[in-house]
Amino acid sequence: MVYTKAWFLQNIARQTLGKNVAVHRPPLKLGNMTNWIQQQQAQTNLSLSNTKAPGSLDERLFLTEDDIIFHDRSIQLGYFDPSLSERKQSPPGKSLHRFVDNLNPNSSHFSASLLPASLSSLCDSTCGDVDDEQQFNSLATSPLSTETQSEVSDPLLDTLTPNSLESSFASISLNSFTSANEFIQFLKRLASSKLSIHTFDLYKLVRNSPELLTLEAYNIVLQCMSTDDYFLSSSKNIQKIIKVYVDMLNSFISPNVTTFETVIFALCRRAKFVHQKIESLSKRTIYAHPSIAKEIQPELLDLQSEMPLQTAVFMFTSSLINHDLIYSPQFYAILIESVSLYGTQSQLDSLLECVPLGTIEANGHPDLLPALIRALGRAKRLNSCFQLLERYNLSDPTSDTSMTNVRSWEGLMEAYFDTDHHVEASALMKSFFRKADSNQVIPSSILDCFLRRLAQLGHYKESAEWLGMAIEKISTYKASPSTLSSILEAACLNNNDKFAIAFVRKYTLSRFSDCHAVLLRYLDLLARSGNVDLLHLHAYPVICSVSSHTNFTFSNVYKAFIENGKIDVALRLLRKHIDPKVSLGNNTAPSSNSVALQLSILNGFWEVLTEELQKDVHVLLSLVSTLENQVNFPQVDFTTPLLRHITGYLVSRRLEPELISPRVFGFLLEYAAFNVVQTEGTFTSKVILTDLLKCYSNGTYKASFKNVHVVLRSFTYLKEDEMLVASVRDDIVSEAVVGFSTDNNGQKILADISQVCYCLDDLECIDQSINSLVSKMLTSASPEQVDVNILFFQFGKLIETNKFLHPEVYPTLISVLSKNKRFDAVQRVFEHSKHLYRKISTKSLEKANWFMALILDAMILSSSFARQFKSSNLFCDNMKMLGYIPRASTFAHLINNSTRRGDTDDATTALNIFEETKRHNVKPSVFLYNAVLSKLGRARRTTECWKLFQEMKESGLLPTSVTYGTVINAACRIGDESLAEKLFAEMENQPNYQPRVAPYNTMIQFEVQTMFNREKALFYYNRLCATDIEPSSHTYKLLMDAYGTLKPVNVGSVKAVLELMERTDVPILSMHYAAYIHILGNVVSDVQAATSCYMNALAKHDAGEIQLDANLFQSQIESLIANDRIVEGIQIVSDMKRYNVSLNAYIVNALIKGFTKVGMISKARYYFDLLECEGMSGKEPSTYENMVRAYLSVNDGRKAMEIVEQLKRKRYPLPVVNRISSLVNSHMGQKPKRRSLNTSHSSLASLGNASTQHSINSSIN
């Protein structure tokens, strides 16, 4: 169905004026519903005071289901749909039925809006298909219909809800709620847990069950949604809140003051977001190149079309009709403040007309009085501002620095300027300065407001004088960047370069580093005034950041340098300006398209070059070097003239070979080839490429390639120059295979080279039929889905017939078999490939070696999967003997599988392997970087991890969500919250971003376990739920930890999470029981409840519903030990044996701590040594640390040192070893008195009598 503006407003009218709305004479000539409702106040009150049965009034005086327009005799209202800011009279002289037809949704004249424009997208986006017209007619034809929408699903709710949540909540049975109260209680638990997205999903599920949705239920849903930033982050999401409100009206539930305040609060917050976003986008479009501005413009226009405050003001004013509502001072403060800051003048006037200034207590909230003064000043009502100041007897801000007092005077200062009384503002400031001489302080916010507004009027010199006086007389005052930028901007707008230069020198350029638009105007002023020396000094440090935030190309700056004969300065600045390392390293740069910006900068630079400079060889070489430094081939507009001019110098040999490096010449060949491919072989592009190939073939210029596949691909366009291509092909291929290119497109590159290097398709020994079948099996499914038995059956036929597969199939076959752990089959394929190698070598040894290099590369991969590291090294050595090295992906697998038994520092191993790839000039891939980053992150070597991540981006590789997940995890491991948040935001803004649950879980776990911040944990949880991926079981466990381990502990919310999982059919696993046991036993010390939960988990296992793991037993043991019930803790160990669950290091850690607590060190040592037994998981560094602490607790330094020696033999990283050994060194340095281990027996008194000791011993035995 379609939700029109008229439909929305008339739903509100129905609630504010009643179902049947009387229309009285004289006729109201109003063009929109908002004003009509406002002016109906008196008439409606009259109708209510003179109560009369509806039937006794003339039927035409009521708006019923069929009367959507307003009429009186020959004058009809509501035919047109003007904006709310305009007043248009409906055209007279039309018959009534004509206007009714116009309101029919099937009519082409059907009005789409009397609703505020902020909701126009809601009206348009909720249209169903044409097939839904019948439903539409039954509901939308009459906005005042007594029928509800309970039987119709809403496409808005269906499309705006993430699929994962929709599918999970679809499993909830409405019959599970026995009453509305039970539903409301569950809703309250979700809301109190701030699970706003789940609250909305639950609402969507029950919206067809009006018996469950009461006013209280609606308010709970609205309050939960309006406090969540997710629902305010976009126009689509804010519409969900409005939609819930409209559903309530359709259900004939009258909103109360809580309802109105909640929805209006949400609209005010949305208005602030829209305002800030518009400001940001405007700065990036006003100075941008048209091609970039065109990309940003649609988003900007969409935001500008939103008017959330129009809706907020309308809802507030209409709510006053026939509603005895008393709004809170906080509500007035927020609404008035929002409209005065972000609203239009007409919105502010409409609001102030309805605000009961005489009755509300402005001192009821600290923000209300300042908001009122600011609003009245903007409304040009300065006398009212003075009246408020007198009424509440505000003190001088130099003596009373309370927040309300200072902000009120700041509002008065704004009011002076809003009403064109800046002279009076200056007089007021003078009075403040006279009092400042008496050691009183002028609040900085008032000073900044005065200076900023004065500068914006154009009185920048006077503002600067006031600023100097403030700095001189007030020692604590420091001008804000916005104040400084306002003064500088005004000077630039007035073209006063002398003042601007002096002002920047006085306050330093660094003070303006974040004022990008002002810096842009300043640099432009320097360029126009010809101050090129100062321009060079000031442009160099800021040009990159200013461009990133404004999308400005600075062609005027380059033009100024060129016109003043400083072309070298311009070229150096250009190189820095588009340096990919600078742009990629600036993660906060908001440029929507950095590539488009770089192209615009380059094209703008070429345009300001004179015709002579466009042919200058040094300029051309500098430009080529700059282009070569970019990540990809820049598709600039001057590619052809650049290549044509520089090729002319090369062909005529006017360019000495020593002036052009092999890499620059190689780039010229690649760039020319790229141009041929891009233009699909135009005549000019092919001429340039052939000329460069001739220069390469005669040996005059040496070349070094990075993207040789582009050159090889361009050969298909040079069929008329086959002899030239043949003469250079072998040299280029030889250059290509050195380094064995292996980036993301490596497989395609290798295919290109294979076609050039050896065309083996016509080998007679290849069985084409089996080769085709095997190739199809290998490529049509993932390796895990390939039927290995059938695959190897086909391969067996080749052995029987002495036939072979195509050489390129063998590496893929080995890879698939390896991933399926069929290493015996891999060995047979390897032996078979040796026979093919011998056959190929009879024709071409070079081609045979290349084939064997591919096979050996695959065998290295296979050996790494099998963890046969000696074999991997052997195969690698054989490759090197042939002149080849493994691919990047092969090295990545070596790193991933590099952990040998007993090796506890695999990060160093990973770095050594990675350094080997660099030594051999292997082109790294994303997969390779991910492998190294993962190892470094787990080893907490974050500095190296971050450095490698930056190196990866600088090399032009685009990080994936896996990459970001790794570096985010590394940042979390060292507790760097700002870095983790920065990386997370960067990950979500990546163009190739594919959401994965792991990074979200990492951030949630980090906020819960490291930062102890429940609010942020819930923020990331809701962000996860807003994607199209489902939360994992671990996510729910972390959510339980957020409520159950962080203060204030909320066990009710923990239960709500479990109830949510149960109602949505999410399996409750052993980890969830373990988390709940920990919360009950360790956090709230309710050991009985924890034990009950533990027994319930065992019963669930016995019933076959869950699978037990060590975490469950660990939580119960820790719970018992925390409550001094070590005996029962030992009994849990017996339960583990009964359920075939092995001890692990973490359970033993708990037992060691428990026994240490009661002085039973020998028992602790028993379990410590038990981990070395066969079938146990082994010790962790924390296990050694706990045992060391146990011995030190009884002053047995010698035994503690023995444990440290054991640790050293395990080859753990040195920092880990040093940290634990320092415990012993510190203890030995103190030389404490030694206690006998026998004291442990005396400590048993804390456990009870001798029978307790017997219980422990028997449990252990």
Curated annotation (Swiss-Prot):
Polar residues composition-biased segments: 1237-1261
What InterPro entries does this protein's entry cite?
A: Pentatricopeptide_rpt (IPR002885), TPR-like_helical_dom_sf (IPR011990)
Q: Where is this region: Disordered?
A: 1225-1261
Q: Which UniProt keywords apply?
A: Mitochondrion, Protein biosynthesis, Repeat, Repressor, Transit peptide, Translation regulation
Where the PPR repeats fall, as residue ranges, is 365-404, 405-442, 443-479, 480-514, 550-584, 806-849, 852-886, 887-924, 925-959, 960-995, 996-1031, 1032-1068, 1109-1143, 1144-1179, 1180-1214
Q: Name one GO cellular component term.
A: mitochondrion
A Gene Ontology biological process noted in the UniProt record is:
mitochondrial gene expression
Provide the phenotype resulting from gene inactivation. Answer: Seems to stimulate mitochondrial biogenesis and especially mitochondrial protein synthesis.
Tell me the compartments it is located in. Answer: Mitochondrion
Organism superkingdom: Eukaryota
GO MF terms, alphabetically ordered: mRNA binding
User: Cross-referenced NCBIfam families, in alphabetical order?
Assistant: PPR (TIGR00756)
Function statement: Mitochondrial RNA-binding protein that acts as a general negative regulator of mitochondrial translation.
Q: What is this protein called?
A: Pentatricopeptide repeat-containing protein 5, mitochondrial
Whichever gene encodes this chain, its name is ppr5
